[in-house]
């Protein structure tokens, strides 16, 4: 996938972590992006994303009704130019009846929701800005033992 020419959600995280120079090298074609096709953590997250969305729909308080499920679209891409910088992000789910987004993650079993929120906050805030959303639900599978979801406000 060509990720040059715009800033994305993962890029926002890298910028906030201080990896902006390497990101700039990649975005300008001076360096190659890492190939994540053999990264098991990344691929497991991709593979379990649909299950994570299904679990969120079934178990999130106030969300399991068919009415709400019908108001959710998976994999929506938002684009905007912010301060003359092209930005693009694809959210895992968009709850269009409430203008809220869903981001799904799969992490190790001893991780905490607080740590996940901290780790992904730049990506979440970036997506909320692009989607003009008021909230983002972070739905996280921890290993194979537990699941949690939490709402993050703009």
Briefly describe each language-model feature range.
Residues 1-54, 59:
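Charged, glycine-rich intrinsically disordered N-terminal tails and low-complexity linkers that flank
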Residues 58-154:
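Nucleic-acid nuclease catalytic cores
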